[in-house]
Structures are given as structure tokens and as C-alpha cells.
Amino acid sequence: MTVDEVKGQVYDIIVTKMGVGKEQIKDDSKFTDDLGADSLDTVELIMEFENKFGIQIPDEDAEKISNVQDAINYIVEKKK
């Protein structure tokens, strides 16, 4: 899975879960500050990333995923 494929799917998940337009999302968008996620939204995003990509994201790692690029990098690394 390429970085671009992961990025596209991460963006799609954010659009679906957060109800924001794809044009509002940037790689450095913070889930809480820029995209309006609360703590429950963030947990749901992490769970959706786990389901979509077939990976496990431990809580200590999830706490470090604060923006879109963090999520993309983490998923790409786990899928290697």
C-alpha cells in the first residue's frame, strides 16, 4: 500500500466520520484544533483506522497521533 493510497483512505475516513469537506483537510490539520474533533471523535477515528487498515493502535501510540500526517505515517509504518 502506497503513501498516497493510505492518505486517500485516511482523508475519506475523516470526511465520513467528522463531516468535513475534503478541501478542509490538510496533512498538518490537527484533529481537535483544526477539524473540531472531541475526545470521542478521536477515539472513533483511531478505531476506524484500525478497522480499515487491519492494524492495532495501542493507546500509548494513539495519544501521539494528533494530526492527519501523524496518522498517515503511523499507518504506512505499520503496513510495511
UniProtKB/Swiss-Prot annotation:
The modification O-(pantetheine 4'-phosphoryl)serine is found at S39. 4'-phosphopantetheine is transferred from CoA to a specific serine of apo-ACP by AcpS. This modification is essential for activity because fatty acids are bound in thioester linkage to the sulfhydryl of the prosthetic group. GO terms for biological process: lipid A biosynthetic process. Its main location: cytoplasm. GO terms for cellular component: cytosol; membrane. Residues 4-79 form the Carrier domain. Pfam families: PP-binding. Coiled coil: none annotated. Pathway: Lipid metabolism; fatty acid biosynthesis. The keyword Cytoplasm applies. InterPro entries: ACP, ACP-like_sf, PP-bd_ACP, Ppantetheine_attach_site. Belongs to the acyl carrier protein (ACP) family. Carrier of the growing fatty acid chain in fatty acid biosynthesis. This is Acyl carrier protein. It comes from Chloroherpeton thalassium (strain ATCC 35110 / GB-78). The gene is acpP.
